[in-house]
Amino acid sequence: LVYWVENSTPEEIRPFVVKGIEGWNKAFEKAGFKNAIVAKIQPDDADWDAGDVRYNVVRWASTPDPRYSGYGPSVANPRTGEIIAADIVQEFNAIKRGYTYRKLWGYSEDNDPLEQWIVSLTMHEVGHTLGLRHNFKASWIYDAKEVHDVSITGDNHIGSVMDYDPINLAPKGMPQGNYFPTGPGSYDIWAIEFGYTPGLTDEDRENLLSKSTQPEYIFGTDGDAMSSPGVNIDPRNYRGDMSNDPITYTADRIETIDAKILELPDIYLVDGKTSTEFRSTFYSLTREKGRFLDGVSRLIGGVYSNRIVSDKNKDITPFEAVPYADQKRAMKLIQDKLLSNDAFSFDPDFIKQLQSEKRAAYSPGRRGNEDPQLHDLVLGLQGRAISHILHPTVMMRLVDSSQYGNTYMPDEVLSDLFDAIFVQGEVPSTFKMNLQSTYVDSLISALNDDDYDEISKSAIYSSLFKIKSFTKVSYGNTTTKVHYNFLNWKVSKALDD
């Protein structure tokens, strides 16, 4: 197979694209082919166009506000299913992203996040053209410490380049491992072996397929992803997580991000520069904290789904509720890092610098509100996790899964949320007030929603009574008292109705 790198590709990254294309040879060797894939650079004087279907081309584009960094479409023979052509597109914003990684996290000749990112992105898109789908469970192969140890991971710290993996960052005091995978993972090699090895017998295929429940080969794709609140059940199938202990990894990641945010003025606010990059990087890192915590929230009410053949893998069950201890650990991290009074606190001098460049184009959505919209930002991050935990499907699953092992019931879940959101004697920040009000609205809405089961509704009813009692307070400043009076009125009205 020959893949051509379009001649419009920036010269400095061409070697990385070539490396990403030919990186698949490691997998094809397992299938019995040596040098199965070759990458070539399209000559500047080529007499053929990159859009010519006769050529498999990795093209380069600069689309305004692209949704993805790359696309890996292919053309298949409708009669046989055979893939006959590939036309990969990679976006210029991928290079910008790589240089941002360098600027934030540093780089060396031996460990360059820009190089690894482009190699990984290219391998991912080439993988699609070879017939592979996304595998979002692949990140669960190593624990939160092993994932940084290249002596264990080699050139791939996840099970597949077909995952949507974030940049891998080692916490303070730990050597930096791979930023991104630069070779096929165990799942990739296994899938290519199954799909491309010539002359496989039925017994050979059965033997290969029997490995599907082993940790290095587990698979979950888009239709199983827990990306939106209440959708799907297996927390391993989440886009953008890392390690088989996402709780520990997320706790480490938040410390790393918080430390880096404090360094942003020294990195970006230098002579002759506007604060645009400073602003966008601050928002990006803050949202990243929310995304990781959102992934942790999926453990609450989660069920591991293992697709097995009944006469094989008898030591594995199709459904396994996430252990109680892990759900409680997940809740504790969410309480401390997402819902607590000091989960989001910002230096006023820092915030004053969050100015964007003035653009000539009119933006109807902003309507001149160019000041930092921090409360919307924080509530959006908190609300996403809360929306998942309180989703009627998740509440029902907590109850249903109690029949096969779950012991973390809705009443305890809501009690833990109450303890984090309403703290006796605490003067809530304005961020916390927003959270409290939104949480109360969510409970009131749930109480009147027929999609909730009766056990969950009774827990919601009980929690609202606790909030009604809590908000009869006389301490705090005027803003606090007015806020709690309003919450008390909302809850009382809902319960009376």
Describe the residue ranges of each PLM region.
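Conserved catalytic/binding loops enriched for acidic/polar residues
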Residues: 139-497
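The catalytic-center signature of Zn2+-dependent metalloproteases
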Residues: 41-61, 116-173
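Carboxylate/His-rich catalytic cores and anion/metal-binding grooves
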Residues: 25, 32-90
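Fold-level signature of zinc-dependent metallopeptidase catalytic domains
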Residues: 1-48, 109, 497
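Short loop/turn segments at secondary-structure transitions that flank enzyme active sites
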Residues: 9, 64-66, 92-96, 136-138, ...
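Active-site-proximal segment of zinc-dependent metalloprotease catalytic domains
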Residues: 5-13, 31, 67-132
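Solvent-exposed, polar/charged alpha-helical surfaces in well-ordered, non-transmembrane soluble domains
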Residues: 15-22, 26, 116, 120, ...
